């Protein structure tokens, strides 16, 4: 009686020719008599106590040891008698003290708006104006506000951030981006001898704030954290006149139907409706001046698009201004007698975006009436490229180490925003 089929015998015999003694790896024909299954065995059924009305299950709870033919008992949760943070279990959402039936749509530093600036303008009821205001541009062109050897100092700041302050051959963006901004701010502080009122300011790192408002039956909130914030003892002067503010009533906000205006916002039912400037009462520098937002992600998928960064600047400046306005004038929705002005600078260490935001009204529910104003100057290159290593071809240095395509007018705008309100 044959123990194997013809193809199986040929496969086993052929393996001996390879020096495997007849017990080597079989050929494909060895599996012609069947198909090997890849399915895993079913897991054993769970030992559960089935609740049958009128019957009491018999378990091994009283035996104090495992009995295979008895049902497994279900013990109540063990109470330690004290709260151990290692084994904390959060309560159900509907039992949380801050739970609310109405959802709140929150914008925070990790949000990326799909429609960018257009979506931010609709959420904040704002009219966009391209370019910086004339009051700021006058500070840019005034030679009295320039620093001695200004271009050379800025080039040293760039080289320090990208070359001198690190031991890496090519430093990462998360390393050099904060250093460039901090050094540029320190360079602007050198003007304190010309403008003594600069001593009435302070720069705070990683400040937080929150502001809540209603927009067409939607409850919105912005929470800011990260970056640097320049605060002052005196508020920034108003940019637009009363006539320009009244003229915004005729402006029509751009919509992006069928896309929802709350797309990419974080929907949450556990929140606290509050307006917080981030500082306690009696803080000596209560007024926001400039927010510095950094896009310092190393990986390209984690970086913000330029339009998304500008939208983040608008919403954070709006939230800071709204929290300050609610603190000064209360929670009633109305047109402000004295508008609140907040500036913002966004950068990735190479490209800068400048914003001046003026909050004219806290009546944000409907599209009619006075609008807020935002002046945006975008995509301003500080330098085109930085060579961390020299480019050598045929033993000749083609590109030396250092920045390429330096744009001195970008720092002049950076300095003008810093001096705004003091010069």
Curated annotation (Swiss-Prot):
Any one GO molecular function term: RNA binding
Location, primary (coarse class): mitochondrion
Cited InterPro entries: mtLSU_mL37 (IPR052482), Ribosomal_mL37/mL65 (IPR010793)
Record localization: Mitochondrion
Transit peptide: 1-29
Classification via Pfam families: PDCD9 (PF07147)
Gene Ontology biological-process entries: mitochondrial translation; translation
Annotated keywords: Mitochondrion, Ribonucleoprotein, Ribosomal protein, Transit peptide
CC annotations in GO: mitochondrial inner membrane; mitochondrial large ribosomal subunit; mitochondrial ribosome; mitochondrion
Description of how the protein assembles with itself and partners: Component of the mitochondrial large ribosomal subunit (mt-LSU). Mature mammalian 55S mitochondrial ribosomes consist of a small (28S) and a large (39S) subunit. The 28S small subunit contains a 12S ribosomal RNA (12S mt-rRNA) and 30 different proteins. The 39S large subunit contains a 16S rRNA (16S mt-rRNA), a copy of mitochondrial valine transfer RNA (mt-tRNA(Val)), which plays an integral structural role, and 52 different proteins. mL37 forms a heterodimer with mL65.
Database matches in PANTHER family: LARGE RIBOSOMAL SUBUNIT PROTEIN ML37 (PTHR15889:SF2), MITOCHONDRIAL RIBOSOMAL PROTEIN L37 (PTHR15889)
Record family assignment: Belongs to the mitochondrion-specific ribosomal protein mL37 family.
Official protein name in the record: Large ribosomal subunit protein mL37
Source taxonomy: Eukaryota, Metazoa, Chordata, Craniata, Vertebrata
Chain's gene name: MRPL37
């Amino acid at each position: 009686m044959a123990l194997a089929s013809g193809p199986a015998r040929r496969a086993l015999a052929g393996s001996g020719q390879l020096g495997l003694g007849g017990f080597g790896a079989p050929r494909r024909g060895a599996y012609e008599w069947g198909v090997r299954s890849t399915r895993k065995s079913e897991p054993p059924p769970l030992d559960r106590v089935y609740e049958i009305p009128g019957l009491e299950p018999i378990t091994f709870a009283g035996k104090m040891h495992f009995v295979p033919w008895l049902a497994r008992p279900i013990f109540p949760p063990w109470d330690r008698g004290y709260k151990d943070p290692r084994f904390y279990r959060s309560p159900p959402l509907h039992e949380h003290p801050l739970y609310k039936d109405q959802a709140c749509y929150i914008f925070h530093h990790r949000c990326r708006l799909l429609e960018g600036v257009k979506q931010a303008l609709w959420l904040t009821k704002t009219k966009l104006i391209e370019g910086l205001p004339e009051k700021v541009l006058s500070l840019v062109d005034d030679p009295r506000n320039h620093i001695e050897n200004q271009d050379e100092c800025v080039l040293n700041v760039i080289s320090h951030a990208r070359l001198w302050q690190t031991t890496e051959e090519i430093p990462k963006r998360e390393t050099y981006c904060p250093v460039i901004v901090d050094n540029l701010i320190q360079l602007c502080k050198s003007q304190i001898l010309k403008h003594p009122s600069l001593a009435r300011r302070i720069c705070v790192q990683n400040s937080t704030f929150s502001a809540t408002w209603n927009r067409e039956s939607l409850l919105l909130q912005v929470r800011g954290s990260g970056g640097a914030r320049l605060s002052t003892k005196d508020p920034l002067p108003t940019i637009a006149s009363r006539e320009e503010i009244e003229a915004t009533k005729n402006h029509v906000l751009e919509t992006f139907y069928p896309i929802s205006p709350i797309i990419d916002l974080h929907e949450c039912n556990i929140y606290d409706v509050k307006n917080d400037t981030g500082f306690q009462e009696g803080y000596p520098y209560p007024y926001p001046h400039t927010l510095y937002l950094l896009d310092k992600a190393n990986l390209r998928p984690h970086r913000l698009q330029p339009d998304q960064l500008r939208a983040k600047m608008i919403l954070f400046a709006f939230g800071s201004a709204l929290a300050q306005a609610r603190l000064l004038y209360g929670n009633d929705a109305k047109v402000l007698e004295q508008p609140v002005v907040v500036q913002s600078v966004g950068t990735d260490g190479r490209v800068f975006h400048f914003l001046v935001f003026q909050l004219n009204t806290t009546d944000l529910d409907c599209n009619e009436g006075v609008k807020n104003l935002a002046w945006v100057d975008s995509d301003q290159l500080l330098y085109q490229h930085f060579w961390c290593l020299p480019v050598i071809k045929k033993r000749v240095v083609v590109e030396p180490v250092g920045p390429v395509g330096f744009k001195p007018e970008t720092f002049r705008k950076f300095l003008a925003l810093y001096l705004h309100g003091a010069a």
